[in-house]
From Swiss-Prot:
This is Cellulose synthase catalytic subunit [UDP-forming]. The lineage of its organism: Bacteria, Pseudomonadati, Pseudomonadota, Gammaproteobacteria, Enterobacterales. It catalyses: [(1->4)-beta-D-glucosyl](n) + UDP-alpha-D-glucose = [(1->4)-beta-D-glucosyl](n+1) + UDP + H(+). Residues 441-501 are annotated as: Catalytic subdomain B. Belongs to the glycosyltransferase 2 family.
């Protein structure tokens, strides 16, 4: 190259070009790519005035405007990427506050859209104002109860007839399309309305479309002339029916969350009841249990009415000694029947409090726990149980392995953020085994904690409800604990839950027997059905292969009709769930959670249906470490098998598209789209199975709290605590940090009006951000530290609000990236014999993805460059 350029170019230009070539090579570009990059640069200098200030601003903002193109390491087709990204920036990603004259039409449309949103936001208030007289005058109040029931019956009957017509009326493709457009238009109109009315309307529209789909599936899509197609079609229809039932029950369960607030306690503390706090443990490390006991000692409650018990099913002497040192009671059984339930029932023989509060040994209660919960028991004499959320300050395997901690709602957020709140509306709150208060008298009436199943908590609440007692749920987190440390431990925990809920379904079926209200029966059944999702999920992951591999028509209908029925059913359900669940579960993430668990919960739930007494209780390990990143090949084996099976389907589908009957081409395309979606979800499951490092023994908790540090010479600095753990803190000093690494300082924290001092050592200094390591603490200092940090009343309350709102399209893009990430991990960790194949496939996909335009990474200086780009 140097000889050619020396002959063609003058020396200064040649020297600069050679320097650019060497720079490209230094950054990893191949010789061909570097040569081509120099050629493109010459063409750019010839045809584009790069010295112009506008182009200079664009070049300065290259990293923001073209985030996927590395200017220091060119690739052969970078000009195509530049062209696509530039068109995207000009057409699709422009965000100018002041529209240009040539876009007045678009500006007018935006004004109309703004007025429409304003009108929709004001609509609920106007409707409330217009209908206020109905509440004031009680226009039906003069009618007898029988007449009001008659009117209600007529309205319900008319509504059911209308719904039946909408569901069963057959349409040709055009009429079906028009009908769907009307419903879709209605959904788009109401989805932005605030309040619960929009959610109710979306539920009605979604149920209309979904019920119509199920009716169509049962009446028009089974091929009775082909045994293979009939069997495969019935299997898929079984899975779809299950999904439809869960959808309907789920809407019912969360249609009107109660959002219960605390009831204040009497000012006279003599009226406050006595409470026993149980902390059961079996094989956990003492360090895991200590924080729970220390926090319990600081609960705001009269000390003469509070008894704390360590229930040690391991019979360990160090636990007995620890209990004696801190002044709590200790019980150890000689026998260990019925695991945790038996441990608690044994303690009930000795405890005499009016209420019992149970915490898993890693769940650290806040100081306000009892004051926030017990007030309801004094107000409602039939209230037997009050449950609060299980909040986790460490990432679960999904969050840690995917790097999504506090960025996406975790798996349990939906249940504790919305489902339990919805259950509370129907008086069907479940006891979850920890972070709860139970009235002792009803608990004694049912014989203590249920021992017949491995999910003793849910079974206990079912028995309380059968006795006519009520339950309650408060969504405000009042305790926090450790999430499972590995995917295998997480799956083991879910297997136990799944087996236990199916055991309850068989042994104490909520649909039968006395004592339950209809709504309670539905809520319990939906909880049990949730854990039966394994087999239906596996069916969905393999269903399109029936047509591609076996030529079985699982949905015996034209591809156009399949699209007109299937897509609206899925889109309406996704839109409705996004509206209802958006703060607690982002769109499409349920697919990942269910896929990871499906293979493992399917066998135990099936066994429990057949033999409910089979199975044993297993304790979930907490507080472990993951020393190195690795793929859990044992856990991921089923996912890889399903990936390979679907890849075979892709290969056969491609062959059938080019060489099969022309009449089946559209059906092949539909099946291939389904297969590719399944591959994305399975890739996400593989990504979860890559265990990330977890080398901290003490998890850091992010929070903002005022504090101060004092040097040995007495000089004080005000600071803000940014995070803390059981072993240290991260602080930000307000001002200049005149502190050195290794220096010993005292940390001053406040709890209420009391100030506490803790000895620390400076572990790191980065500007005004300082890392502190706690020096060895006395028992009392450790108690004080836990109560100043983990047990603060406001520590966990705002975590839920930190999650971003759900945006379905962005969430779908996240799942696409996640799926691709899983296959990249397979390429990285696969055995050498197959690593080459995975690398070729992932490199091919990466190459295709590199052409997709990206939204610019906005910065403070990006605006002028964006404007300059639009003017070229």
């Amino acid at each position: 190259m140097s000889i050619l350029t020396r002959w063609l170019l003058i020396p200064p230009v040649n020297a600069r070009l050679i320097g650019r070539y060497r720079d490209y090579r230094r950054h990893g570009a191949s010789a061909f790519s570097a040569t081509l990059g120099c050629f493109w640069m010459i063409l750019a200098w010839i045809f584009i005035p790069l010295e112009h200030p506008r182009w200079q601003r664009i070049r300065a903002e290259h990293k923001n405007l073209y985030p996927h193109i590395n200017a220091s390491r060119p690739r052969p087709l970078d000009p195509v990427r530049y062209l696509i990204q530039t068109c995207w920036l000009l057409i699709g990603a422009s965000r100018k506050e002041t529209p240009k004259p040539r876009r007045r039409a678009f500006s007018g449309l935006q004004n109309i859209r703004g007025r429409y949103h304003q009108w929709m936001n004001e609509l609920p208030e106007r409707v409330s104002h217009k209908t206020q007289h109905l509440d004031e005058k009680k226009e039906l109040g003069h009618l007898s109860a029988g007449a009001r029931r008659l009117i209600l019956g007529i309205i319900v009957t008319f509504s059911l007839i209308l719904a039946l017509i909408c569901v069963t009326q057959p349409f040709n493709p055009l009429a079906q399309f028009i009908f769907l457009m009307l419903l879709w238009g209605g959904a788009l109109i109401v989805r932005r309305m605030p309040g619960r009315f929009s959610a109710l309307m979306l539920i009605v529209l979604s149920l209309t479309v979904s019920c119509r789909y199920i009716w169509w599936r049962y009446t028009s899509t089974l091929n009775w002339d082909d045994p293979v197609s009939l069997v495969c079609g019935l299997i898929l229809l079984f899975a779809e029916t299950y999904a439809w039932i869960v959808l309907v029950l789920g809407y019912f369960q969360v249609v009107w969350p109660l959002n219960r607030q605390p009831v204040p306690l009497p000012k006279d503390m003599s009226l406050w009841p006595s409470v026993d706090i149980f902390v059961p443990t079996y094989n956990e490390d003492l360090n895991v249990v200590k924080n729970t006991i220390y926090a319990s000692l600081g609960i705001d409650w009269p000390k003469d009415k509070l008894n704390i018990w360590i229930l040690d099913d391991g019979g360990r002497e160090e636990f007995r000694q620890f209990a004696q040192n801190v002044g709590v009671k200790y019980i150890a059984r000689t026998t260990h029947e019925h695991a945790k339930a038996g441990n608690i029932n044994n303690a009930l023989k000795y405890a005499k409090g009016e209420f019992v509060s149970i915490f898993d040994c890693d769940h650290v209660p806040t100081r306000s726990f009892l004051q926030m919960t017990v007030g309801w028991f004094l107000k409602e004499k039939q209230l037997a149980m009050m449950q609060t959320p299980h909040h986790f300050f460490s990432p679960d395997p999904f969050e840690r392995n995917l790097g999504r901690f506090r960025k996406t709602p975790n798996e349990g957020t939906l249940f504790y953020g919305l489902v339990q709140d919805g259950n509370d509306m129907w008086d069907a709150t479940f006891f979850c085994g920890s972070c709860a208060v139970i009235r002792r008298k009803p608990l004694d009436e049912i014989g203590g904690i249920a021992v017949e199943t491995v999910t003793e908590d849910a079974h206990t609440s079912l028995r309380l409800h059968r006795r006519g007692y009520t339950s309650a749920y408060m969504r405000i987190p009042q305790a926090a604990g450790l999430a499972t440390e590995s995917l295998s431990a997480h799956i083991g925990q879910r297997i136990r839950w799944a087996r236990g809920m199916v055991q309850i379904f068989r042994l104490d079926n909520p649909l039968t027997g006395k004592g339950l209200k209809f709504a309670q029966r539905l809520c319990y059944v939906n909880a049990m059905f949730h854990f039966l999702s394994g087999i239906p999920r596996l069916i969905f992951l393999t269903a399109p292969l029936a047509f591609l591999l076996l030529h079985a028509y699982i949905i015996y209908a034209p591809a156009l009709m399949i699209a007109l029925f299937v897509l609206p059913h899925m889109i309406h359900a996704s839109l409705t769930n996004s509206k209802i669940q958006g703060k607690y579960r982002h769109s499409f993430w349920s697919e990942i959670y269910e896929t990871v668990l499906a293979w493992y919960i399917a066998p135990p739930t099936l066994v429990a249906l057949i033999n409910p007494h089979k199975g044993k209780f297993n304790v979930t390990a907490k507080g472990g470490l993951v020393e190195e990143e690795y793929v859990d090949w044992v856990i991921s084996r089923p996912y890889i098998f399903l990936v390979l099976l679907n890849l075979v389907g892709v290969a056969v589908g491609i062959w059938r598209y080019f060489y099969g009957p022309p009449t089946e081409m559209l059906t092949v395309v539909v099946s291939m789209v389904w297969v590719f979606y399944n591959l994305i979800v399975l890739g996400g499951a593989v990504a979860v199975s890559v265990e990330s490092k977890q080398v901290r023994r003490s998890h850091r908790v992010e929070m903002t709290m005022p504090a101060a540090i004092a040097r040995e010479d007495g000089h004080l600095f005000s600071c803000t605590v940014q995070d803390f753990s059981d072993g240290g803190l991260g602080i930000k000093i307000n001002g200049q940090a005149q502190i050195l690494e290794g220096q010993k300082v005292n940390l001053l924290l406040k709890r209420g009006q009391q100030e506490y001092v803790f000895p620390t050592q400076v572990a790191r200094v980065m500007g005004n951000e300082v890392g502190l390591k706690l020096m060895p603490l006395t028992t009392q200092q450790h108690i004080d530290f836990v109560q100043c940090t983990f047990a603060r009343a406001d520590t966990w309350a705002l975590w839920q609000d930190s999650y971003p709102e759900d945006k379905p399209l962005e969430s779908l893009l996240d799942i696409l990236k996640l799926g691709f990430r899983g296959y990249r991990h397979l390429a990285e960790f696969a055995p050498s014999s197959v690593k080459g194949i995975f690398r070729v496939l992932t490199s091919l996909v990466s190459w295709v993805v590199s052409f997709i335009p990206r939204r610019p990474e906005r910065s403070e200086t990006a605006q002028p460059s964006d404007q300059a780009l639009a003017q070229q």
